């Protein structure tokens, strides 16, 4: 089973959009996948579920339940550690790690774990999402929304991953805003300064076919278990 932790350079950069497209391409290619959203916030306007959890379940056509993919959820779209403190919920690295590792014995080809926001999103006053990724020891897929500021945010995230010896499996350029100019130039700059070639560039009207090449990279036998 391949395992990947999906993070963004920031919040609202399209992580869940990318996750659902990866799910779609796996489903079309009969690749057995499961995408977890261990920590979620922000209730959907259509149900009692958090919006990101609902989107993932919809991508799977509800063959999984919310409890199978999500451990902790908050109705308010607020930073997890803040709303956790307000509601007296403990976002424990140990509990999250156990929730994720309990899926390792399932018959899956690939396991995605979609994070909450960026790499250093706090879970508490003394822990961040980085601590969970380090505990899991699995590669990261980084999503960057190409816009003003993305070069700095992407390079900072890649540098921090490298500083902690976390493998970057690939990074995705989410070009979902047609008003942004010089997207190719921004992507090239990130590639040149980071040393990591963009795994795939996703346009506003992308479909699952745009993720075929990326899925082949992720499922390749060269990728570490």
From Swiss-Prot:
Cofactors, names only: Mg(2+)
Reaction catalysis annotation: (7R,8S)-7,8-diammoniononanoate + CO2 + ATP = (4R,5S)-dethiobiotin + ADP + phosphate + 3 H(+)
Residues annotated for Mg(2+) binding in this entry: 16, 52, 114
Recorded metabolic or biological pathway in which this protein acts: Cofactor biosynthesis; biotin biosynthesis; biotin from 7,8-diaminononanoate: step 1/2
SUPFAM superfamilies: P-loop containing nucleoside triphosphate hydrolases (SSF52540)
Gene Ontology biological process terms in this record: biotin biosynthetic process
One protein family per Pfam: AAA_26
Location of this chain's protein in the cell: Cytoplasm
Keywords, sorted A to Z: ATP-binding, Biotin biosynthesis, Cytoplasm, Ligase, Magnesium, Metal-binding, Nucleotide-binding
Keyword Ligase found: yes
UniProt-listed Enzyme Commission number(s): 6.3.3.3
Any Gene Ontology CC annotation: cytosol
A GO molecular-function descriptor: ATP binding
UniProt: ATP binding residues: 12-17, 52, 114-117, 174-175
Protein's UniProt keywords contain Metal-binding: yes
Residue numbers annotated as active site: 37
Summary of the function given for this chain in its UniProt record: Catalyzes a mechanistically unusual reaction, the ATP-dependent insertion of CO2 between the N7 and N8 nitrogen atoms of 7,8-diaminopelargonic acid (DAPA, also called 7,8-diammoniononanoate) to form a ureido ring.
Description of how the protein assembles with itself and partners: Homodimer.
Similarity comment: family membership: Belongs to the dethiobiotin synthetase family.
Official protein name in the record: ATP-dependent dethiobiotin synthetase BioD
Source lineage: Bacteria, Pseudomonadati, Pseudomonadota, Gammaproteobacteria, Thiotrichales
